[in-house]
A protein has these predicted regions:
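Structured C-terminal helix/loop/strand segments within mature extracytoplasmic catalytic/sensor domains
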Residues: 24-61, 167, 172, 232, ...
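Bacterial N-terminal signal peptides that target proteins for export
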Residues: 1-10
Length: 359
């Protein structure tokens, strides 16, 4: 086997301090230095205090978790916000595909691209991990539309579809510019799945990793000390990090039509409602008539610790009341505890809604 190139990743600044568990918004917290093109947290409008019983439940759920968790829930109707450790930066993983989609729809709104624009994917576009589109690409190339890439990236969390969409609208900088222009706050965006995942592992990306199990073999060939240092550095200061509060507030603005045109807003939320991933997360706790338009994210597993298990989206009650929710976790064990926590938070939000609105 050929030797594997790897590097130690130094100089990324201090870890972001974890926010204190609180049901009240805290508007300032120290953040690590941001990478070029990233955005400093912005001050947002103050919301009302969340219902005390719900805030207490979310705090109790968060404190009982085996790992690190951040939760933010925003009621769009009543303008309250319930937070737990919601200013800490958490790994987004595939949740960052949402911002690629928003940037793409924003480009559509500005007339820069059309969702009907054709694109062709070849072997050089392949990424790693989950990429269902790979079989079509390996069959001699695959021509599709930007709209199809967006749908596949969100609903199936396809890494290759996402990265091709990102490059088609201007690359990582276009996404970062959108985040900054729309004042989304404490949300970072890295350079796509290939760059992100290889850096987390302690590797330098090679396109050969996109085929078969080459990435896994290269990662396994690294000294454990390299993998551990790279993984822990990412957990401390994630290159794609986002604060649950910023994510929930961004989702609330999306739902309210503040980020995109009415047509693009409806289309993106409809696509998010078709998401197939995360069946054991928030969706598993829904009661009849409730809807969940969302994006999931799952990180790499190193010695049983997961670099992010997340579910973010818009929870809608049968009466139309909408809640923006961001639940972001770094579990100490891959034992299903993160998924259970998400279900418990969802049940608490639904129970609070039913108690206050009569079911």
């Amino acid at each position: 086997m050929t030797s594997v190139s790897y590097r130690f990743l130094f100089g990324l600044g201090l870890a972001t301090a974890a926010g204190l568990a609180s049901s009240q918004p805290v508007r300032t917290d120290p953040l690590a230095p941001l990478p070029p093109g990233s955005v400093r947290p912005q001050v947002t409008s103050t919301t009302r205090a969340a219902p005390a019983s719900l805030a207490a439940q979310i705090n109790a759920i968060g404190r009982g978790f085996n790992g690190i968790v951040g939760v933010s829930v925003v009621s769009l109707r009543d303008n309250w916000q319930a937070d737990y450790n919601a200013t800490r930066l958490f790994p987004q993983q595939s949740c960052s595909k949402l911002w690629v989609a928003v940037a793409a729809m924003d480009a559509v709104d500005k007339g820069r691209v059309s969702l009907n624009d054709k694109v062709t994917l070849g072997r050089s576009d392949l990424t790693l991990f989950h990429q269902p589109i790979r079989s079509k690409v390996l069959g001699g190339g695959h021509t599709t539309t930007l709209g199809s890439l967006l749908f596949t990236a969100i609903t199936q969390s396809d890494n290759t579809a996402n990265d091709k969409l990102m490059r088609s609208i201007g690359g990582p900088e276009a996404v970062r510019n959108m985040i900054e222009a729309k004042n989304l706050g404490s949300i970072r965006f890295y350079d796509g799945e290939r760059a992100l995942q290889s850096r987390i592992a302690g590797l330098i990306w090679s396109q050969s990793y996109s085929i078969g199990d080459a990435f896994y073999k290269a990662r396994s060939a690294l000294p454990t000390s390299v993998r551990k240092a790279s993984f822990e550095r990412y957990i401390r200061d994630p290159y794609d990090g986002a604060a649950p509060r910023a994510v929930a507030e961004g989702l609330a603005r999306l739902q309210k039509g503040e980020l995109l045109s009415p047509g693009s807003t409806r289309r993106l939320l409809s696509i998010m409602a078709s998401t197939k991933t995360g069946g054991l997360r928030v969706r598993a706790a829904l009661k009849p008539g409730w809807e969940w338009s969302h994006k999931t994210g799952t990180g790499q597993n190193f010695q049983g610790r997961i670099g992010g298990i997340n579910d973010i989206g818009i929870l809608t009650a049968p009466d139309g009341t909408a809640y923006a929710m961001a639940i972001m976790t770094i579990p100490n064990k891959s034992d299903g505890g993160a998924q259970e926590l998400m279900r418990e938070v969802t049940k608490a939000v639904i129970a609070n809604h039913e108690a206050r609105r009569g079911g």
